[in-house]
């Protein structure tokens, strides 16, 4: 009899015990009118999003999100979509409401005037179109007036002032060896396509990208009045110069190693790398003394920059600078230029078929350049105090769980554990918004001229950064704006930062069960804390210094465990012939693996001394935890954006951010009663465990 049942539906019996129970429950639920009428989230988990036809032990990402993705196609103006991205779009709508509700009369220099007039100028598309390229002409005229390459160098400094930072960029950076001090950092920035491989690799997709880029450059020059022949020649000039800079630029995997860009230098050493650039005049323009502490990220790049100053013609340098100015300023220029910019960067590279509506583009720009002014208004209206208090408690619990986890690592010596404890003890969490807001009152924001207003706001960003150079580090500064739906870890400050924008569903629910919040925002917290001990963060000690604090054997074991994670992700294919680069995504993957484990431990610890929470909708608290994580990372993504991510992004695509870490966790296997041979259970000899 049993064999007969198996023959009729053999797949049913190969499924996990949990999946068989779930399908039986689903059959009962479908007979219940009460269940049919109930289609709303409960404590943060919307069970209607689950694809119950999929065994969670086979593909947990599809189980957690399959129905939601089927019902929610990616909007035409987005390159990916999920509840998390939906929440980000909700935040933009909230910012729009703030901006459009500002009073008509605003005092000059007030927050309301600064953000309101910037947004209003950006929204005045008819005036932007009517002005045409007139605002760009004075810049082009300055470039045209140069009699030799040396005469272009002061213009490079002026362009750097408005964030047109080519072919190098000067910015602030904490000293890797004295992180209490801020030094001047000279970085490479010689090309505009997403990655050096787009210029150098012979693969068909990269060859096609080069052809599309040439066509795009030519179209952009034609839109500012150049003829077909001149535009095509200019495109080839830009491609030639950018390719030369790409050839000497470090690749993204190498750039993940802090020591690869750690080159503390003097003014004399910088001058020796590029003696044909007038560094004395450049530093004078930037109001920096020549004896300022500095770092040169890529010395070989600076040597190539010097060669190009000698070998590239004046005419070609002029084209290169004009292109970078035009490319950077497209967001503030007439609609045809902005549209062509989208055609290449949005449609071709990322796969989006429509531009975002203008109000979204203008809201994004306001946040990008005037983020703390707008953010102050945002937190006043949308960030409840109880959210910050709940987050502070969760961060404390996650830090304690990370501490306990490290202390139980059998492969670490007591000496290394003690140093790790010092790092845990000095973690500095920042939640919601900065204690002190930036002062934008002197920024010349005008409602009637968007191009100039856009450049004035950019100049503020550059000057605000430059003014920190040569001074003690200000630990109160933030690297993200309050409305940002993201988080980050800074190893030089040993801080984890969670802006207000991420502290909303689906990451965080004030009224949710602990299982849901620990599974979503808890894993995010654990992820950021784990960055302090990933392949990059582990190179910095508790004071933020780039210094080895590991014993030789412990470091060897750590690298071996990291290699396991890299190998796992090397084998995740996006499409035939294209797979993740495990070394590129190693840090984020260690963060996801450590974050999921530590958050689960913290959740378990939070239950000590309390009655066991009840099941909800047939799901145990442990299952709710993992579903919350799966749904937080439940992105749908366009193929073009997926290819771009695999090439350039240190984050794996969302599917593998769910499947990858969970398939290593016995806690997940136990929660869903997965068979040992299930796809979501890695073989014992393949399990990766770092933390």
Residue ranges and their predicted role:
Residues 20-27:
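Sec-dependent signal peptide recognition
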Residues 32-34:
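N-terminal signal peptide c-region/cleavage motif recognized by signal peptidases
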Residues 54-127:
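Active-site-surrounding "flap" and adjacent substrate/cofactor-binding loops of secreted or lumenal enzymes
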Residues 88, 238, 244, 273-276, ...:
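Intrinsically disordered, low-complexity linker/terminal regions across diverse proteins
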Residues 49-70, 199, 203-222, 586, ...:
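Hydrophobic/aromatic-rich, well-ordered segments within soluble, folded domains that form packed cores
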Residues 37-39:
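Boundary at the C-terminal end of the N-terminal hydrophobic targeting segment
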Residues 102-397:
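Noncatalytic, helix-rich "gating/capping" subdomain that lines the substrate-entry/channel surface
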């Amino acid at each position: 009899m049993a064999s007969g049942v198996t023959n009729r539906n053999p797949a049913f019996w190969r499924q996990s015990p949990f999946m068989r129970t779930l399908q039986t429950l689903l059959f009962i639920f479908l007979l219940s009118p009460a269940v049919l009428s109930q289609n709303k989230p409960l404590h943060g988990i919307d069970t209607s999003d689950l694809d119950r036809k999929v065994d969670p032990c086979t593909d947990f990402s599809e189980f957690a999100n399959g129905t939601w993705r089927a019902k929610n196609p990616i909007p035409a103006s987005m390159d990916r979509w999920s509840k998390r991205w939906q929440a980000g779009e909700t935040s933009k709508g909230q910012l729009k409401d703030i901006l459009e509700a500002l009073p008509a009369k605003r005092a000059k220099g007030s927050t309301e005037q600064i953000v309101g007039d910037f947004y209003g100028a950006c929204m005045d598309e008819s005036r932007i179109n009517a002005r045409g390229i007139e605002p760009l002409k004075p810049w082009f005229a300055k470039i045209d007036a140069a009699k030799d390459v040396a005469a272009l160098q002061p213009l490079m400094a002026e362009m750097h002032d408005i964030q047109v930072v080519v072919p190098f960029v000067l910015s602030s950076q904490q000293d890797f060896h004295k992180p209490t001090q801020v030094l001047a950092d000279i970085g490479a920035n010689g090309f505009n396509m997403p990655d050096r491989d787009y210029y150098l690799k012979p693969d068909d997709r990269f060859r096609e990208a080069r052809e599309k880029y040439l066509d795009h450059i030519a179209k952009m020059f034609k839109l500012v009045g150049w003829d077909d022949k001149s535009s095509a020649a200019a495109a080839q000039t830009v491609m030639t110069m950018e390719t030369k800079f790409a050839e000497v630029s470090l690749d993204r995997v190498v750039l993940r190693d802090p020591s690869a860009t750690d080159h503390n230098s003097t003014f004399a050493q910088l001058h020796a790398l590029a003696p044909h650039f007038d560094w004395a005049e450049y530093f004078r323009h930037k109001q920096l003394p020549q004896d300022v502490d500095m770092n040169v990220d890529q010395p070989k790049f600076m040597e190539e920059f010097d060669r190009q100053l000698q070998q590239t013609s004046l005419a070609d340098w002029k084209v290169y600078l004009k292109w970078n100015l035009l490319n950077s300023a497209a967001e503030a220029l007439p609609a045809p230029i902005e549209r062509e910019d989208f055609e290449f960067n949005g449609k071709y590279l990322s796969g989006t078929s429509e531009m975002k509506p203008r109000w979204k583009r203008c809201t994004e720009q306001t946040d990008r350049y005037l983020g703390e002014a707008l953010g102050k208004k945002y937190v006043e209206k949308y960030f409840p105090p109880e959210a910050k208090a709940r987050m502070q408690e969760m961060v404390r619990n996650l830090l304690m769980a990370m501490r306990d986890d490290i202390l139980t690592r059998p492969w670490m010596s007591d000496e290394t554990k003690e140093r790790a404890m010092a790092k845990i003890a000095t973690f500095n969490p920042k939640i919601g918004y900065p204690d002190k807001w930036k002062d934008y009152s002197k920024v010349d924001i005008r409602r009637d001229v968007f191009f100039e207003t856009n450049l004035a706001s950019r100049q503020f960003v550059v000057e605000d950064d430059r003014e920190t150079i040569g001074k003690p580090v200000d630990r109160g500064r933030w690297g993200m704006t309050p409305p940002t739906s993201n988080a980050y870890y800074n190893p030089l400050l040993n801080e984890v930062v969670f802006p207000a924008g991420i502290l909303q569903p689906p990451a965080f629910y004030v009224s949710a069960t602990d299982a849901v919040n620990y599974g979503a925002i808890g894993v995010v917290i654990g992820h950021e804390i784990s960055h302090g001990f990933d392949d990059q963060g582990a190179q910095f000690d508790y004071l933020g210094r780039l210094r080895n604090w590991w014993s030789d054997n412990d470091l060897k074991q750590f690298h071996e465990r990291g290699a396991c994670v890299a190998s796992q992700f090397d084998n995740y294919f996006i499409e035939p012939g294209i797979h993740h680069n495990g070394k590129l995504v190693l840090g984020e993957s260690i963060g996801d693996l450590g974050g999921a484990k530590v958050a689960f431990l913290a959740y378990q610890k939070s239950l000590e001394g309390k009655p066991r929470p009840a099941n909800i909708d047939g799901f145990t608290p442990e299952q709710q935890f993992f579903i919350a994580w799966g749904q937080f990372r439940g992105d749908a993504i366009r193929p073009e954006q997926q290819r771009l991510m695999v090439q350039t992004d240190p984050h794996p695509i969302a599917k593998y951010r769910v499947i990858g870490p969970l398939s290593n966790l016995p806690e997940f296997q136990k929660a869903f009663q997965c068979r040992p041979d299930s796809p979501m259970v890695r073989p014992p000899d393949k399990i990766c465990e770092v933390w």
